[in-house]
Amino acid sequence: MNKLKKEANVFFKKNQTAASLDFKKTLPSIELFSATLNSEESQSLDQLFLSESQNYSDEEFYQEDILAVKLLTGQIKSIQKQHVLLLGEKIYNARKILSKDHFSSTTFSSWIELVFRTKSSAYNALAYYELFINLPNQTLQKEFQSIPYKSAYILAARKGDLKTKVDVIGKVCGMSNSSAIRVLDQFLPSSRNKDVRETIDKSDSEKNRQLSDFLIEILRIMCSGVSLSSYNENLLQQLFELFKQKS
């Protein structure tokens, strides 16, 4: 019986080791995700340490400590980004399985609700992973990884072709979160912003149609040979001056 237990233990340990190695093979290289702090993040840390500067006695050791903490901060960001990608990969694979014919169309969504505290976090990780794997090279993947989380999630989730998203990555790389989001809104506006813009465009179109009707009527009256009053001449003069200012 003891011999059987020993053999079972050896078997399980071997399989556990093999599974661990297989998992490590799927892990992206840590070098790929070594996050460099952007200027804003680095300045924030400098500002934090500035208040501590009066306490140091050795300038050289103090600077070494600051550099070490900055390095650790970058490594923490790398680990966080690895986590998001690994999470996104698992959700991506689960969706492939749950999209098969023998599952209903709502199974994947129900699975998300069952597994995750919020659906948005799952879909954000999925969108993040999908954009990452579709980027054509490691340079772009590194640039995408350097973008602040919120901006990266928004970029991944926004509707738009890959070329546009690649262009946006180049534009926002190194920017702060708020600056990056402003650029995103310009080149990849959200559906809500598009709807508002379309409503404004429709409103302008309707006003222009009405203005065309009024102007045509004014031209018709003036061509009829009517004698304009000084008041109407003044109104027309104001209209011409306003038009010159806008043109």
Curated annotation (Swiss-Prot):
Keywords for the protein's UniProt record, in alphabetical order: Plasmid
Keyword Protein transport belongs to the record: no
Keyword ATP-binding annotated: no
Coiled-coil intervals, chain numbering: none
One Pfam family hit: UPF0137
Outcome when changing residue 9 to D: In plasmid pCHL1 and plasmid pCTT1
Family per similarity comment: Belongs to the UPF0137 (pGP6-D) family.
Additional facts recorded: pGP6-D is required for growth within mammalian cells. The sequence shown is that of plasmid pLGV440.
Protein name: Virulence plasmid protein pGP6-D
